[in-house]
Amino acid sequence: IAMVKIEGLYNTAFCYTPVLEDAARAQIQSVCDQKEFAGCKIRVMPDVHAGKGCTIGTTMTIRDKIVPGMVGVDIGCGMETVELSEREIDFERLDALIRKEIPYGREVRDEIHALNAELDLSQLCCADQVNLNRAMRSIGSLGGGNHFIEVDRAEDGRLFLVVHSGSRHLGTEVANFYQDEGRRALWGGAHYQIKATIDQMKAEGRFKEIQKTITALKREHDLSIPKDLAYVEGALFDDYIHDMKLTQKFAVLNRKAMVDVILSGMGLTPVDEFTTIHNYIDTDAMILRKGSVSAKAGEKLLIPINMRDGSLICSGKGNEDWNCSAPHGAGRLMSRKAAFNALSMEEFQKEMEGIYTTCVVPDTLDESPMAYKSMEEIVAQIGPTAEIIERIRPVYNFKAAD
């Protein structure tokens, strides 16, 4: 398979892709250039593309430091895949049910879903930084962007319900709090200490020593790490891991609540169900996955490609060289902005023919199949880490604009 090697000052990353955009290369290079991440095993998945503050498709082993921004704001985002016993579904009725019962975009539920009982968000270390009421009413809400509800059909006619969503605004609140705390811990005290020292030296008339002292203090506090890579360690590390796991559970319950609304509202019967998560830290193996999924030996996982081509159901191979990971999708070919500028609604409508959807609208053009890498590119690369069990194709799709 194709691979790009990126050598930095303190680490070397392997990217399992034939081509790598410059922005993603620069982000990965920046991580490899920090001595704090020396010794971390960095493996980047085939669906790699530049993201906000970090590269989508990143996997890396971690020890005593974590960059909250590398996990990102949608902590625990992923897919719930449910095999159904039914072979036919009334899609018009399903679409009406979703629009009536599942909030999407920025909306949340009026009433709290029963699954809230399985989670106590007041246990968050950063609970006072979070809108708990909004969070509780968000369990059972889809959100926007690339989140979707889909029904897919296997070759033999079996139907699958797939729900892709995450931790909604709660994840953003938790991520931003810890990223800010990391910055404050790394630099806030240093800047304050430098200013206080200068004031004191001025008061004592030691003007000639000021510059030398500032240089020494800056070296001591190492203010060289990029803002996006501010990390947490010590007690903050422990608090972040604790809150990330709670937020991850919240994201799982959010998807399960939507599945519950659909199954009960439509009278559908589940046969099998599995979860695939792609923004989190696997605390058992201490592996960070950002836009990548776990692919341990025999583990069932879903790789969604796009609205037209559906998803691959795979089995992990437990390849240590890949950090036991696989791509979380096809990966974007163009940015959202570029997609809105370059793509046409005519082409979008043509590509989605034969799939029941009320969501092929100008606002979702950035999510059209043309905005993503091809299925062939991903299939060509994943052999060492995952075995494709079957491909499932969309027959119904619901996706909200932001």
Language-model segments: what does each one mean?
Residues 59-60:
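Glycine-rich phosphate/pyrophosphate-binding loop regions near the starts of catalytic domains
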Residues 46-47, 74:
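Acidic active-site catalytic centers that drive phospho-/nucleotidyl reactions
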Residues 68-124:
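A generic, well-ordered mixed alpha/beta core segment in the N-terminal half of proteins
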